[in-house]
């Protein structure tokens, strides 16, 4: 849980180390530049998945297309919009995953070594299954390395 929140000493050190690593910035730039730019260019859609909030950002003219609030037609159109947004989010996440896979060759060796040492150490701990150890390593990479670059790409 502490790794996931990024509040334990190890995850803080990992994040600070990866932020200062030039090869990490190269990897993040190579991996995330194109999908983030595409997302920014195609930023017309508000990818909201909460039915109560789907129409909040729409203009009154756009809201009228959903019908009268509370009607069955309105609910169906909102649900259709939610499903369309979910499909767009799935496609977007798959695009990011594709770029991550495509650029694994330039993943920084020092970060690879740290994660492998973490994996080896945690694999020896009684009571931890291999799946849990893999999840912890993945959480560390996502929480402290990849997601911050997606949320704040200018820094990288």
List the predicted regions and their residue ranges.
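Extended alpha-helical scaffold/tether regions of large eukaryotic proteins
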Residues: 1-156
């Amino acid at each position: 849980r502490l790794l996931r929140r990024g509040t334990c000493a190890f995850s803080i050190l990992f994040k600070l180390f990866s932020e200062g690593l030039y090869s990490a910035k190269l990897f993040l730039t190579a991996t995330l530049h194109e999908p983030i730019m595409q997302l920014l260019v195609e930023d017309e859609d508000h990818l909201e998945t909460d039915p109560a909030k789907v129409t909040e950002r729409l203009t009154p003219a756009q809201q009228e297309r959903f019908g009268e609030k509370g009607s069955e037609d309105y609910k169906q159109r909102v649900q259709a919009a939610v499903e369309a947004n979910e499909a767009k989010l799935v496609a977007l996440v798959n695009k990011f995953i594709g770029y991550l896979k495509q650029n694994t060759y330039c993943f920084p060796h020092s970060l690879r070594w740290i994660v492998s040492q973490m994996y080896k150490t945690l694999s020896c701990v009684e009571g931890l299954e291999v799946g849990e150890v893999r999840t912890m390593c993945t959480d560390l990479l996502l929480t402290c390395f990849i997601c911050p670059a997606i949320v704040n790409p200018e820094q990288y």
